[in-house]
UniProtKB/Swiss-Prot annotation:
Example of a GO cellular component annotation carried by this entry: cytoskeleton
Family matches, as PROSITE patterns: ACTINS_1, ACTINS_2, ACTINS_ACT_LIKE
Role noted for this protein: Actins are highly conserved proteins that are involved in various types of cell motility and are ubiquitously expressed in all eukaryotic cells.
Highest taxon, organism lineage: Eukaryota
Gene3D superfamilies: 3.30.420.40, Actin, Chain A, domain 4
Organism: Tetrahymena thermophila
GO molecular function, a single term: hydrolase activity
Family label: Belongs to the actin family.
Alphabetical UniProt keywords: ATP-binding, Cytoplasm, Cytoskeleton, Hydrolase, Nucleotide-binding
Location in or out of the cell: Cytoplasm, Cytoskeleton
EC number(s) reported in the record: 3.6.4.-
InterPro entries xrefs: Actin, Actin/actin-like_CS, Actin_CS, ATPase_NBD
Name of the protein in its database record: Actin, macronuclear
Transmembrane region(s): none
Length: 376
């Protein structure tokens, strides 16, 4: 069996970042933006060995002359040609491996359309000729990475936020909830807040600047109203940020008004529940006998949960909704930005997992639909 000889490749396809590496490592070797850029004016970049498309960091560096596209929206691949370019870049440029020689584990958001998995499977076997393949649900991997098999994962990345109760290693599908509000919406909202104070950022290139401001300066207020009041009374919490052109801007109460959107989606006119209500509703859909465990093991995962103060605030909000006798514990592992990848690395290097792979022979016999039988 080929699997045992070479280590597996683990790729966590996020809407914003693609994380990739070798199973058994404790962190991904590559993490690059899931972006494909094509020249706005083909043929104008003379003498630069112009390519028809750029991927990841390179696309970001040349963003001024490119049109940028994210092939994954809300956790679902919307453009398979671009996605193929990202995977190709991943194997050959970032990891420098030949996919024909390694089993490959990919991740996906829960409640993804069946067709999405089938297309992933088809691409991996037919375009990249991998010897064996598996698709795992992101939230389950995050829980493994935190050393638990039971709990509820609040996973918020760039494109989608979901709450996934997991019991003894299995996601409870009837209790999974998801909202299409995550990092990308926060970036857009931050853009809107800065526009209110006269700063206009609108192009795809400038959006990356906003994303950086959001990641470096924003935080979640424990008490939103009190924080607003404090900012009105003094300006000592203002932070300055230097733009790429050398100008400096001052970011004020936008610092906490931006991530507040996670708790109050109504700010942008969405009728979604906030992440605290989502967590509570998800737990309430579980069987009454198993609710104690998820309340006590709320595990945060994904880049959008990296805001300072988010764990304390979520704990406070869920406590207000839950029965008063219930013990609430929010776990925020420091490596949660990569916890999905880490879980994938752990899972695919277990000896007990080696029989779970979909092999090329099984694929040839059953076609892409084999993925629904072997990966759940």
């Amino acid at each position: 069996m080929a699997e045992s000889e070479s280590p597996a490749i683990v790729i966590d396809n996020g809407s914003g970042m693609c994380k990739a590496g070798i199973a058994g490592d404790d962190a991904p070797r590559a993490a690059f933006p899931s972006i494909v850029g094509r020249p706005k004016m083909p043929g104008i970049m003379v003498g630069m060995d112009q390519k028809e498309c750029y991927v990841g960091e390179e696309a970001q560096a040349k963003r001024g002359v490119l049109n940028l596209k994210y092939p994954i929206e809300h956790g679902i691949v919307t453009d398979y040609d671009d996605m193929e370019k990202i995977w190709h870049h991943c194997f050959y440029n970032e990891l420098r491996v030949t996919p024909e020689e390694h089993p490959c584990l990919l991740t996906e958001a829960p409640q993804n359309p069946k067709l999405n998995r089938e297309k992933m499977t088809k691409t991996m076997f037919e375009t990249f000729n991998v010897p064996s393949f598996y698709v795992a649900i992101q939230a389950v991997l995050s829980l493994y990475a935190s050393g638990r098999t039971t709990g509820i994962v609040v996973d918020s990345g760039d494109g989608v936020t979901h709450t996934v109760p997991i019991y003894e290693g299995y996601a409870l599908p009837h209790a999974i909830l998801r909202i299409d509000l995550a990092g990308r919406e926060l970036t857009e909202y931050c853009m809107k807040l800065l526009y209110e104070i006269g700063l206009n950022f609108s192009s795809t290139a400038e959006r990356e600047i906003i994303r950086d401001i959001k990641e470096k300066l924003c935080y979640v207020a424990i008490d939103y109203e009190a924080e607003l009041k404090a900012y009105k009374e003094s300006s000592q919490n203002d932070k300055s940020y230097e733009l790429p052109d050398g100008n400096t801007i001052t970011v004020q109460d936008q610092r906490f008004r931006c991530p507040e959107l996670l708790f109050k989606p109504a700010f942008i006119g969405k009728e979604f529940p906030g992440i605290h209500e989502l967590t509570f509703n998800s737990i309430m859909k579980c069987d009454v006998d198993v609710r104690k465990d998820p309340y006590n093991n709320i595990v945060l995962s994904g880049g959008t949960t990296m805001f300072p103060g988010i764990a304390e605030r979520l704990s406070k909000e869920v406590s207000a909704l839950a029965p008063s006798s219930m013990k609430i514990k929010v776990v925020a592992p420091p490596e949660r930005r990569y916890s999905v990848w880490i879980g994938g690395s752990i899972l695919s290097s277990l000896s007990t997992f080696q029989t779970m792979w979909i092999t090329k022979a099984e694929y040839d016999e059953s076609g892409p639909s084999i993925v629904h039988r072997k990966c759940f």
